[in-house]
Amino acid sequence: VTATRVDVIGVPMDLGADRRGVDMGPSAIRYAGLNAAIEALGIPTRDHGNIPVRVAEEASPEEARAKYLPIIAEACELLALQVEAVVREGAFPLVLGGDHSIAIGTLAGVARARGRAPGVIWVDAHGDINTPITSPSGNVHGMPVHFAIEAQSVAPERIVFIGLRDVDAGERRAIRELGVKAFTMSDIDRIGMAAVIAEALAITIDGPGSLHVSFDMDGIDPTEAPGVGTPVRGGISYREAHLLMEAVAASGALGSLEITEINPILDRENQTAILAVELVLSALGKTTL
């Protein structure tokens, strides 16, 4: 990590998802000892608290094809402003979700501050590249890549999906047509995580601070990360996830990171949040030896 300080930003967003509880993710990750663990690596932290997000009870879904989109966009704009300010200060933004719709805000903030779109490694069981028209559910957490590309916060040729195993027909089409590099679990089985990582870094990195990692905890196998709203069997292993994060750290290019989709209601004794903290530490440079 090139920055001298890690700035934590919580986004208690659950309007993009069907199952309630993912708004408690930022608290769960903090309870798992995030800030103290980062400080123990010798990196100062600053916690900005949480971005205000309206709760579902005071809002209406409005447009069925993209439920709560205006309210999600409002929170994402506040997040973008905060992330932009952090990056301009020379600090490292660590964003805690919340559902994956928050990536719209994180990526916008990073792109504005750096004056260009970052390369993005997107770890996820799902494609998250539906449009309001192709989405079967109308849930915005399945659309952030579409909206980020539309806003020019990311270029399709500089985003890499890792861990895909549940992809909608419209998403398959979008991935093909846009030329997005996507590694499914079958690809990881076939060529190994190390080869996947090498290719992903080659595609996404373009100088120091040019890499953003957007990590949906449902990318990991549910036996290791049960506390997610949309679990899919056969995911990334504990060891593969750490290998990825250690490689990201070793690249020296990581400029920002977000962890999304932890749902403490569905978790077992906060194990998914504890794993998230371990993965953050690996991404920030913690190694076994």
Q: For the regions a protein language model found, what residue spans apply to each?
A:
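Active-site histidine-anchored catalytic micro-motif
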Residues: 88-158, 251
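A short helix-to-beta-strand connector/capping loop
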Residues: 43, 155-157, 177-180
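Catalytic cores of soluble, metal-dependent hydrolases
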Residues: 2-13, 19-94, 112-113, 181-289
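Short glycine-/acidic-enriched loop or helix-start segments at secondary-structure transitions
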Residues: 18-20, 105-107, 131-132, 171, ...
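Active-site flanking residues adjacent to catalytic metal/cofactor-binding acidic residues
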Residues: 98, 123-125, 162, 213-217, ...
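Short, glycine/polar-rich helix-capping loops at beta-to-alpha or helix-loop-helix junctions
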Residues: 166-177
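Short, glycine/acidic-enriched loop or turn micro-motifs at the edges of active sites
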Residues: 102, 125-129, 166, 217-221, ...
